[in-house]
Amino acid sequence: MKRIYSYNNQEHILYLVATPIGNLEDMTFRAVNVLKSVDRIYAEDTRNSKVLLERYDIKTPLYTYHEFNKELKEDEIVDFIKKGASVAIISDAGLPVISDPGFDIAKRCIKEDIPVTPIPGASAGISALIASGLPPKPFMFYGFLDSKTTKRKQELEALKYLPYTT
């Protein structure tokens, strides 16, 4: 992975941009600036993302990138970045990659020596932790539980014995 010495908006880069998790005013100045300056934004659900982009007068072209098309979109995104473009990935709420699309494209970009820069912001897991009254150390984020009841019960049973706030 390449070390980045400047955090000014760049070309040939993938940004993973955090979005608000419930209040549109939780959007950071930096996130707005990045989304205005990139060549394309790829979003989990463009219908949800349009509300955010309109709120901050972001006119950057918006494309879909989600669980069901990510394999098709990876080549498109990587090729676009290699031609000199900058791209941002956003999820519906919170941080891309964390229980949302983004891991595969970030991994691919790193493999191809394309810089990947996170633009931090709201995080549901950390927000819940700091308001919970539970010990913050050690802490483990597990992610979404399985949608199937039997599997979900098995996951919860295994998690309850961990020595972490989970």
Describe the role of every protein-language-model region.
Residues 63-72, 144-149:
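Conserved helicase motor
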Residues 83-140:
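Short glycine-cluster motifs
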Residues 35-41, 113-117, 166:
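Short active-site oxyanion
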Residues 1-68:
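Glycine-rich, flexible N-terminal cofactor/catalytic loop recognition
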Residues 67-82, 101:
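Short phosphate-binding loop-to-helix
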Residues 2-4, 11-12, 127-166:
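Beta-strand/loop-alpha-helix module characteristic of Rossmann-like adenine-cofactor folds
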Residues 13-14, 83-88, 164-165:
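Loop/turn-to-beta-strand initiation segments
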